[in-house]
Amino acid sequence: MSTLTRSNVVGVIAGVVRWIGLLCALVLVVHVLLTVGDANPDNGITRFFSTAADPLALAFKSLFTPDNAHLRVLVNYGLAALFWLIVSAVLSRLIRRLA
């Protein structure tokens, strides 16, 4: 019978934080790919990722305003994806270190 140690619990929590950040970044990247690739906006998959990506983009959604809509999505949502990756990595390390 294995016992659940504090270090195991902390490791799981840190891993969950990391995976959440990765999933947020993945949603944003898929939205960028669908937008830049001119996916049909009426398609259910495209609508799902567009709807899911908007709140994840936070303030990055309108950070840069180039005239080209594809470039705007690529830069702003791409920066938001990087943000989620960095924040989740930092939080994961902090959780492991402080616990």
What are these regions (language model features)?
Residues 52, 78-90:
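Hydrophobic, lipid-facing residues on alpha-helical transmembrane segments of integral membrane proteins
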Residues 1-6, 95-99:
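Short, charged juxtamembrane terminal tails flanking transmembrane helices
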Residues 29-33, 60-61, 87, 91, ...:
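Alpha-helical membrane-inserting segments
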Residues 16, 45-63, 67:
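Hydrophobic alpha-helical segments of integral membrane proteins
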Residues 2, 7-20, 85:
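N-terminal intrinsically disordered, cationic/polar leader segments
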Residues 36-41, 67, 94-98:
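Membrane-interface elements of multi-pass transporters and channels
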